[in-house]
């Protein structure tokens, strides 16, 4: 099952954000889930925000669920992804309620 990882990216320290998203993706793989990481969508930081959100939405629509990282509400893109998931009836999981990474990782 594919699950889309959604969270704040714009305006963050990209090195730290990449580590966070990668850790979540690794944990998902460990439990048999296929993660879809928007930081690995083939676009670069030089592409426009509009190009990123268009690709992210296309990728989201190929998934069975969305996993919202803490702080997602602070991200325009993550709020759009959440809205779409809500409107199409996609299951939504929240890191705050269903952490996928243990404190030891």
Residue positions per predicted region:
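Conserved catalytic or regulatory cores that recognize and/or transform ribose-phosphate-containing ligands
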Residues: 1-105
């Amino acid at each position: 099952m594919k699950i889309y990882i959604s969270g704040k990216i714009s305006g963050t320290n990209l090195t730290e954000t990449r580590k966070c998203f990668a850790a979540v993706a690794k944990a998902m793989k460990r439990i048999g889930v296929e993660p879809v990481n928007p930081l690995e969508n083939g676009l670069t930081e030089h592409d426009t925000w509009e190009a990123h959100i268009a690709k992210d939405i296309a990728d989201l629509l190929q998934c069975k669920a969305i996993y919202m990282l803490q702080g997602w509400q602070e991200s325009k893109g993550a709020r759009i992804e959440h809205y779409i998931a809500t409107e199409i009836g996609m299951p939504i999981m929240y890191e705050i309620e269903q952490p996928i990474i243990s404190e030891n990782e």
